[in-house]
């Protein structure tokens, strides 16, 4: 990952949306949340959102990046404000990992991860966006790194099975001391 000199790095938390017009590295950590990356290949500008929920009932409230539909609207407004069209962007989707797989079939628990995945895919289709890649679903968390100077997105996926195995091994080492 060759990084140009003087590149800014921004870490997005849940509910944040960032759009940059200069070389920037965007990072986030996802569980059941989903990140959408927007990259304009000619202008080398773009952004990323980290949404938590598919949507809400909105009544005269400002846009809120915690919700998929509103985060997408924020990204689209940034694209238009920079003299570009949303369909010119390369879009990638990440996340929606089930964090509580043992409760997956519990009728009393809403599956937020699945709802977020469906919302992201539906929004990409609804806005006729150029979906270039996706890494959605499964279990566990993902570390995302998005380089705006070249459009590369790096993903490190840690499934729950691996997390549980690592924790078990660590506990065994501690118990053996």
Curated annotation (Swiss-Prot):
One of its GO terms (molecular function) is protein-glutamine glutaminase activity. The gene is cheD. One of its GO terms (biological process) is chemotaxis. The keyword Hydrolase applies. SUPFAM superfamilies: CNF1/YfiH-like putative cysteine hydrolases (SSF64438). Probably deamidates glutamine residues to glutamate on methyl-accepting chemotaxis receptors (MCPs), playing an important role in chemotaxis. This is Probable chemoreceptor glutamine deamidase CheD. Belongs to the CheD family. PANTHER family: CHEMORECEPTOR GLUTAMINE DEAMIDASE CHED 1-RELATED, CHEMORECEPTOR GLUTAMINE DEAMIDASE CHED-RELATED. Disulfide bonds: none annotated. The keyword Signal does not apply. InterPro entries: CheD-like_sf (IPR038592), Chemorcpt_Glu_NH3ase_CheD (IPR005659), Cytotoxic_necrot_fac-like_cat (IPR011324). CDD domains: CheD (cd16352). Pfam families: CheD (PF03975).
């Amino acid at each position: 990952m060759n990084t140009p000199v003087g590149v800014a790095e921004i870490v997005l938390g849940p509910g944040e949306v960032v759009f940059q017009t200069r070389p920037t590295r965007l990072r986030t950590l996802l569980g059941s949340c989903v990140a959408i990356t927007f990259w304009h290949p000619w202008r080398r500008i773009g952004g990323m959102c980290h949404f938590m929920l598919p949507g809400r009932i909105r009544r005269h409230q400002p846009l809120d990046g915690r919700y998929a539909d509103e985060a997408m609207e924020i990204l689209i407004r940034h694209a238009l404000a920079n003299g570009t069209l949303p369909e010119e962007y390369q879009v990638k989707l990440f996340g929606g990992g089930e964090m509580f797989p043992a409760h997956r079939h519990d009728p009393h628990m809403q599956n937020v991860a699945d709802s977020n995945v469906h919302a992201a895919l539906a929004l990409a289709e609804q806005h006729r966006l150029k979906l270039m890649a996706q890494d959605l679903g499964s279990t566990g968390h993902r570390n995302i790194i998005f380089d705006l100077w070249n459009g590369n997105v790096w993903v490190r996926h840690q499934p729950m099975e691996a997390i549980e195995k690592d924790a078990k091994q660590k506990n065994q080492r501690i118990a053996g001391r």
